[in-house]
Amino acid sequence: MIHVVDTVTEPVEIEQGIKIVPAANTIITTLDKIASWGRCSSLWPLTFGLACCAIEMMATAASHYDLDRFGIIMRATPRQADVMIIAGTVTKKMAPVIVNLYHQMPEPRYVIAMGSCACSGGIFNTYSTVQGVDEILPVDVYIPGCPPRPEALIEGLLKLQEKIKTEPHKKTGCLSGVCLIDKSQRRCSYESCRDNKKD
């Protein structure tokens, strides 16, 4: 419902950081709010389906659930994606490939672990499987289930949108294609994690 107020000329704060100036038909906000709104309203996930959870992920992208209405468009290349959805069992042979794809994604980037196998290793507690994607990548949203329903994936994507909306915009210091990102805050790469576990 839209209320038109002609008598008020002072800015009215409708949300923290967002003001409306009625007489000038102007909205005043911070650049961080606009950037966060843009990032959360247009998620482009890179789908990485490795097992039976991938079938549910494909069903979520089909016309019945229509992810486009949430601003979510599946991408086929990591260079155009900002969210990686890992659905299924991750083997130790596949882990370096996933880490490589993750590092090809532009900042800010997010990871969703979909299914019991991606969250904790699931029923595959063997020497050849990674016991949760968080051993190799920083995970933002966990979606449990074997396999989780498409509604659960949609809820996870909406939770990620809420998280993006509330987090401050990170200054990466990008200048002419060279990004100066503080790597100390990121989780270690797969090779260094693997070497630390041998000690």
Curated annotation (Swiss-Prot):
The gene is nuoB1. Belongs to the complex I 20 kDa subunit family. The keyword Translocase applies. It is found in: Cell inner membrane. This is NADH-quinone oxidoreductase subunit B 1. [4Fe-4S] cluster binds at C52, C53, C117, C146. It comes from the Bacteria. NDH-1 shuttles electrons from NADH, via FMN and iron-sulfur (Fe-S) centers, to quinones in the respiratory chain. The immediate electron acceptor for the enzyme in this species is believed to be ubiquinone. Couples the redox reaction to proton translocation (for every two electrons transferred, four hydrogen ions are translocated across the cytoplasmic membrane), and thus conserves the redox energy in a proton gradient. It comes from Thermodesulfovibrio yellowstonii (strain ATCC 51303 / DSM 11347 / YP87). One of its GO terms (molecular function) is iron ion binding.
